C-alpha cells in the first residue's frame, strides 16, 4: 500500500498539487486495505488520512494501513486541511458533484486520474488473487454439472453462487447471468423461472480477498448454434494470441471485430471486446474501438466477443488474461463444455 501512496505523491509533486481526495470505496480499499461500508474521505498527502463514518470506525481502525479519524463534518475536515497549509486539491474523476461543491470554495481543484493509472497495473499479489477467484469460479461451474442440470435458470444461478461461496468466495463478483434459448441474445439477460433451453449461456464470477473474476461459456446444441460458436471462438482465440505490450487496446478490439465482420455478423457484435478487472468488475482500460490506451505488462483484461441474433440465440465466450510479454489466460476451463 505504501508504494501506491508513494507513486501518487510523486504525481502530486509533478503537477504541483498538495493532496488527492478519494471517496470511491474500492479506491479507498486499494490505498488502505479498508473498504468503507458507509462513506469515507481518503486524503493522500505527506501524512495520508481517512475520515471514516462513525459506524465504520471499528472496521476502519481494524483494517486501515493509514491513520483514521472519525468524520465530524465537512467544515471540520476542510479546516484541518487548511491548517496544514493545503491550498489545492486533486480529486478522483468519479468524485460526486455534491462532494466537489463542498470543497470548491476553499481549494483550487482539478480532476486527476492518478488512481486509475495506478490500478491499471496489477501487482503479482493482485494477479494471484484474481487467479484464485477464477479458480473458485471455474471449479464451481464444473461442480454445477450444467449439461446434466434440470433446474430453472434462477435455480442454476442460485446454485452457482452457493457453490462459489462454499468453495471459498466471499460472494459473486456481479449478478450471475444464466440464460438460455432465445433470451441468450440479450447480453445482460436476467435469469428466469423457466427450465433451461438451448443454447445455455452463463456469465459468472467470484470475489476472493476483494478481487474479481469473470468468465462466460455458451453451451450449444444445434449445427446453427455450433456455426456461430465457432466464429466467436475464432475471434476470442485470435484476440488473445495478438495481445502484447505496446499495442493499443482498440487494436485488439479490431482483431476480434474484424473476424466477426468477415463472417457477416459485424452488426451482431454489440459491445466491446473486453474490460479490465480487479477490485471492481469493470475497470480501465478496455478492449474497445474508442480506447487508445497502450497495453502494458501487468494489465489484467477480459476477452469476450459475442454474436447476438435477436429472436434466435446468442453466443459469448469470455476469459480473463494477464499480460506480460504476451497474454496468458487465467484459469484452465475449456471453451467447449461437453
Regions found by a protein language model. Give the residues of each.
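Active-site neighborhoods and metal-handling regions in enzymes and metal-associated proteins
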Residues: 1-338
Amino acid at each position: 500500500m505504501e508504494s501506491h501512496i508513494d507513486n501518487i505523491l510523486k504525481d502530486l509533486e509533478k503537477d504541483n498539487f498538495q493532496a488527492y481526495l478519494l471517496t470511491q470505496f474500492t479506491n479507498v480499499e486499494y490505498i488502505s486495505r479498508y473498504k468503507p461500508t458507509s462513506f469515507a474521505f481518503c486524503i493522500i498527502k505527506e501524512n495520508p488520512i481517512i475520515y471514516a463514518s462513525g459506524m465504520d470506525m471499528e472496521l476502519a481502525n481494524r483494517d486501515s494501513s493509514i491513520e483514521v479519524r472519525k468524520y465530524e463534518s465537512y467544515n471540520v475536515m476542510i479546516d484541518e486541511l487548511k491548517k496544514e497549509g493545503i491550498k489545492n486539491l486533486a480529486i478522483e474523476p468519479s468524485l460526486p458533484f455534491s462532494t466537489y461543491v463542498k470543497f470548491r470554495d476553499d481549494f483550487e481543484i482539478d480532476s486527476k486520474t492518478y488512481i486509475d493509472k495506478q490500478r491499471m497495473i496489477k501487482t503479482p499479489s493482485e494477479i494471484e488473487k484474481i487467479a484464485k477467484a477464477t479458480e473458485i469460479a471455474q471449479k464451481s461451474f464444473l461442480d454445477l454439472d450444467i449439461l446434466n442440470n434440470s433446474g430453472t435458470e434462477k435455480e442454476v444461478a442460485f446454485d452457482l453462487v452457493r457453490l462459489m461461496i462454499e468453495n471459498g468466495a466471499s460472494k459473486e463478483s456481479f449478478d450471475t447471468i444464466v440464460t438460455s434459448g432465445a433470451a441468450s441474445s440479450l447480453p445482460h439477460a436476467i435469469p428466469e423461472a423457466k427450465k433451461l433451453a438451448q443454447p445455455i449461456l452463463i456469465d459468472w464470477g467470484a470475489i476472493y480477498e476483494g478481487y474479481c473474476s469473470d468468465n462466460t461459456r455458451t453451451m450449444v446444441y444445434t449445427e446453427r448454434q455450433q456455426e456461430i460458436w465457432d466464429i466467436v471462438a475464432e475471434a476470442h482465440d485470435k484476440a488473445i494470441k495478438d495481445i502484447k505490450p505496446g499495442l493499443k487496446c482498440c487494436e485488439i478490439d479490431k482483431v476480434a471485430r474484424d473476424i466477426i465482420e468477415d463472417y457477416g455478423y459485424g452488426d451482431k457484435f454489440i459491445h466491446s471486446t473486453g474490460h479490465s478487472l480487479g477490485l471492481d468488475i469493470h475497470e480501465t482500460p478496455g478492449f474497445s474501438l474508442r480506447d487508445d490506451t497502450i497495453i502494458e505488462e501487468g494489465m489484467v483484461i477480459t476477452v469476450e466477443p459475442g454474436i447476438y441474433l435477436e429472436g434466435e440465440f446468442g453466443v459469448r465466450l469470455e476469459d480473463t488474461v494477464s499480460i506480460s510479454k504476451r497474454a496468458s489466460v487465467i484459469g484452465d476451463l475449456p471453451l467447449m463444455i461437453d
